[in-house]
Each structure stands twice: as structure tokens, then as C-alpha cells.
Amino acid sequence: MPPKFKRHLNDDDVTGSVKSERRNLLEDDSDEEEDFFLRGPSGPRFGPRNDKIKHVQNQVDEVIDVMQENITKVIERGERLDELQDKSESLSDNATAFSNRSKQLRRQMWWRGCKIKAIMALVAAILLLVIIILIVMKYRT
């Protein structure tokens, strides 16, 4: 015959079971259960399995150490990349300033060359004029 279930529970049934369960949990002080959950299984039955767990835990610890080192390296790499980006921006700014200054200097030198050529042409014209005047005066006399 199937078990009979109550369709409706009254408050005494619910609170009574909650109180008794709470009392059992608080009053029963089982160190074995706490040891099991805090330290893991022990004894001859769990020996090889416990060794496997320790081995796996050691591997997990090694992986954690490697990942922490990798994260540290990534952070350092990011810092170096930031420094490199700052240096490249500075270099780009310096290159732009150099380009502008070189264009300005090229113009100055071009004008200076033009001035020197103009002065030389003027001196040559004056010398030629003086020579012509001397020759003309020599033939007039």
C-alpha cells in the first residue's frame, strides 16, 4: 500500500520539524564530520586516493604559480608598452618639429643664396660699369 501524504501541513508540523532539526544540528558536536569536511577523507581506505588528490592539488598549485607569474609578466609588458608608446609619441612630435624647422631653414638658406647672388651680380655690374667708363674716358682723350 502506498504511503499516505498529508495534503496540507499545519504550522505545528513545520515548526516542530524545523526546531528539532535545528536542535540536532546545534547539539550534536561531531568532530569526525568536521574533520572530514575540513581535512578530507583519511584512513587506509582513502590512502591512494588522498595521494592522487595531493598530487592533483600540487599540480593545481604549480599552475596557479605559473599563471601568477604570467599575469605579472603581462602587467610588466603592458607598462613597457605604455612607455614605448609615450616614447614613440615624443619621437613623432620631435620629427614633426624637425621637419617644420628644416623647411624654415631651407627657405632661409635659399633667400640667403639669392641675396649673395644678387650682391655678386651687382658687384660684377659695378665693376663692368667702371671698366667701361675707364675705357670710354681713355678713348675720348
Curated annotation (Swiss-Prot):
Superkingdom classification of source: Eukaryota
What residues form the membrane-spanning segments? 116-136
Starting at the broadest rank, the lineage of the source organism is: Eukaryota, Metazoa, Chordata, Craniata, Vertebrata
| Chief localization | Golgi
| Family recorded in the similarity comment | Belongs to the synaptobrevin family.
The source organism is Homo sapiens (Human)
Function (record text): Involved in the pathway that functions to remove an inhibitor (probably synaptotagmin-4) of calcium-triggered exocytosis during the maturation of secretory granules. May be a marker for this sorting pathway that is critical for remodeling the secretory response of granule.
SUPFAM superfamilies, alphabetized: SNARE fusion complex
Residues in the Vesicular compartment per record: 137-141
- Name of the protein in its database record: Vesicle-associated membrane protein 4
* Membrane-topology annotation of the record: Single-pass type IV membrane protein
